[in-house]
Curated annotation (Swiss-Prot):
Membrane topology annotation: Peripheral membrane protein
Enzyme Commission code: 3.6.5.n1
Membrane spanning residue stretches: none
InterPro entries per the UniProt record, alphabetical: EF-4, EFG_III/V, EFG_V-like, EFTu-like_2, G_TR_CS, LepA_C_sf, LepA_CTD, LepA_IV
Protein name, per record: Elongation factor 4
UniProt-listed Gene3D superfamilies: 3.30.70.240, Elongation factor 4, C-terminal domain, Elongation Factor G (Translational Gtpase), domain 3, P-loop containing nucleotide triphosphate hydrolases, Translation factors
Family statement drawn from the similarity comment of this UniProt entry: Belongs to the TRAFAC class translation factor GTPase superfamily. Classic translation factor GTPase family. LepA subfamily.
Function noted in UniProt: Required for accurate and efficient protein synthesis under certain stress conditions. May act as a fidelity factor of the translation reaction, by catalyzing a one-codon backward translocation of tRNAs on improperly translocated ribosomes. Back-translocation proceeds from a post-translocation (POST) complex to a pre-translocation (PRE) complex, thus giving elongation factor G a second chance to translocate the tRNAs correctly. Binds to ribosomes in a GTP-dependent manner.
Keyword tags: Cell inner membrane, Cell membrane, GTP-binding, Hydrolase, Membrane, Nucleotide-binding, Protein biosynthesis
Origin species: Paraburkholderia phytofirmans (strain DSM 17436 / LMG 22146 / PsJN)
Enzyme class: hydrolase
Length: 597
């Protein structure tokens, strides 16, 4: 066990984490040169394309150190994005050490800091590494100063390397062997194994990636999940040397996989503890929590006959993404679809993109909403994740909205515009610190404001230099109202939004004006109204198309013309009673793009 090292790599997006992982695998001879492709560990096409890591992956490697000893290195690649922070904390709790990779030309960024703090809280030793030192813009002294300033760990002897050229990567491995402690654990104790990740394989069912903390596991053992209590016989155990390789047993300190014929992913929850049925562990490993979705949106197929196909594709996606929630939903305007819950905005985009790309779905998505806590007059509290389910204003005592703590990092030049943005989004400033050229701002902002377009606008006002991460803080009472859109007196449920009262008038007017442009003129007048409860806050009219009925009257008596006009008016009135207005697709998409001023 003294020769095992478990480590993961922490880095901000694009700081070269996956490339460094590739180099390490190459040096340790995990794959032949023929099988080496860039970003070996990012197995989804989408991961390669966006250059982000979504699922955790591992590689068990052997490294012959300069002192002649052979070490077993278990590398656990973690996702770097804030939406997947729970997966990161699970991956980190399976390690004793973490490489903190910082781009020498860019310095420290928000998500690096967030994940690094997670690592320090979990008692993981953090080893700083400066990457991309081959770039002409690299400034290692500055980066070292920033690491010490912002994160507060000693970085004077940080290893310099360039993952792209392979320069200095061996020094990184040497530092790893020297500084990371070997795992603790007793191979003879009752089995405790932490599930780091799990995914669905078409041939063998669910594959669980585990870190064995205590005990030993062999094929044919019966295992039990401690959170769900389900039992399964083990079929195979083994490790990934990126390729899977079956072993006789896995014992304390190792990271490997278990295949046990599990049919659905919900049974193998990330963070759960696996133990043996006949010799159970007295207690599960700490830190398991059910992941709750934070952002909700409706997904509807463009063609109604695609509903079943959408359901099947969501089921298939859920096999590989346990944090995705969905339930059927009917909207009068959009037909049948699903209400889906996501961990955050990136997660939502990825799910949409995978549905469109891997399953060829054409989708309409409604505006993303967050979960509100509503205290009713009769004393009951309900959670509302869909504006259509919001009770009448007369029944509501108070509405509480989720507040998130947002950490923002940016160069000094952009502080002013970022503060303006946060104030527009009803944020309150908690803290502001200067670290050299970088500034760290901490704000509390309602989550509903963050999910709409906060991230895009932050990037555009700071020219892409600002970075952010957020975490849920609490529910707080707020003056939020539901704005409904009526078309000729009929409510269109898919267009309802929940906004703060101060923005409700503006929002109602904007949406009404936008719809007036997009709904084609009918044969009768169409009234578009925005309402809060029974109060109408905005109205737009679409004038009717009409035939000139007076064209054939030359001169003649006024009463003759009046008669024809009255007759036309009566006809239009009759039409209005039976006619229904088709709302084009563009109208729904336009609503999502109404900017909050």
């Amino acid at each position: 066990m003294d020769h095992i090292r478990n480590f993961s790599i922490i880095a901000h997006i694009d700081h070269g984490k996956s490339t460094l992982a590739d180099r390490i695998i190459q040096i340790c001879g995990g794959l032949s040169d023929r099988e080496m492709e860039s970003q070996v560990l990012d197995s989804m096409d989408l991961e390669r394309e966006r250059g982000i890591t979504i699922k955790a992956q591992t590689a068990a490697l052997t490294y012959k150190a300069r002192n002649g000893e052979v070490y077993n290195l278990n590398m656990i690649d973690t996702p770097g994005h804030v939406d997947f922070s729970y997966e990161v904390s699970r991956s980190l709790s399976a390690c004793e050490g973490a490489l903190l990779v910082v781009d020498a030309s860019q310095g420290v960024e928000a998500q690096t800091v967030a994940n690094c703090y997670t690592a320090i809280e979990l008692g993981v030793d953090v080893i700083p590494v400066l990457n991309k030192i081959d770039l002409p813009a690299a400034n290692p002294e500055n980066a070292i100063a920033e690491i010490e300033d912002v994160i507060g760990i000693d970085a004077t002897d940080a290893t310099h390397c360039s993952a792209k050229t392979g320069l200095g990567v061996e020094d990184v491995l040497e530092a790893l062997v020297a500084k990371v402690p070997p795992p603790k654990g007793d191979p003879e104790a009752p089995l405790q194994a932490l599930i780091i990740d799990s995914w669905f394989d078409n041939y063998v069912g669910v594959v669980m990636l585990v870190r064995i903390v205590n005990g030993t596991l062999r094929p044919k053992d019966k295992i039990r999940m401690m959170a769900t209590g389900a039992q399964y016989p083990v079929e195979h155990v083994g490790v990934f040397t990126p390729k899977s390789k079956n072993l006789e047993s896995l014992s304390a300190g190792q990271v490997g996989f278990i295949i046990a014929g599990i049919k659905e992913l919900a049974a193998a929850k990330v963070g759960d503890t696996v133990t043996l049925v006949n010799r159970p562990a007295p207690e599960p490993l700490p830190g398991f929590k059910e992941v709750k979705p934070q952002v909700f949106a409706g997904l509807y197929p463009v063609e109604a006959n695609q509903y079943d196909a959408l359901r099947d594709s969501l089921e298939k996606l859920k096999l590989n993404d346990a944090s995705l929630m969905y339930e059927p939903e009917v909207s009068q305007a959009l037909g049948f679809g699903f209400r889906c819950g996501f961990l955050g905005l990136l997660h939502m985009e990825i799910v949409q993109e995978r549905l469109e790309r891997e399953f060829d779905m054409d989708l309409i998505t409604t505006a993303p909403t967050v979960v509100y806590e509503v205290l009713q007059r009769d004393g009951t509290t309900i959670m509302v994740e869909n504006p259509a389910k919001m009770p009448e204003p007369s029944k509501i005592e108070e509405v509480r909205e989720p507040i998130v703590t947002v950490n923002l990092y940016m160069p000094q030049d952009y502080v002013g515009s970022v503060i303006t943005l946060c104030t527009q989004k009803r944020g309150t400033q908690i803290n502001m610190q200067y670290h050299g050229r970088q500034v760290q701002l901490t704000y509390e902002i309602p989550m509903g404001e963050v999910v709409l377009d906060f991230f895009d606008r932050l990037k555009s006002i700071s020219r892409g230099y600002a970075s952010m991460d957020y975490e849920f803080k609490e529910y707080r009472a707020a003056d939020v109202v539901k704005v409904d859109m009526l078309i000729n007196g009929d409510k269109v449920d898919a267009l309802s939004v929940i906004v703060h009262r101060s923005q409700s008038q503006y929002r109602g007017r904007e949406v009404a004006a936008k719809m007036r442009e997009l709904i084609p003129r009918q044969m009768y007048d169409v009234a578009i109204q925005a309402t809060i409860g029974a109060n109408i806050i905005a109205r737009e009219n679409i004038k009717a198309l009409r035939k000139n009925v007076l064209a054939k009257c030359y001169g003649g008596d006024i009463s003759r013309k009046k008669k024809l006009l009255e007759k036309q008016k009566a006809g239009k009135k009759r039409m209005k009673q039976v006619g229904s207005v088709e709302i084009p697709q563009e109208a729904f998409l336009a609503i999502l793009r109404v900017e909050d001023k």
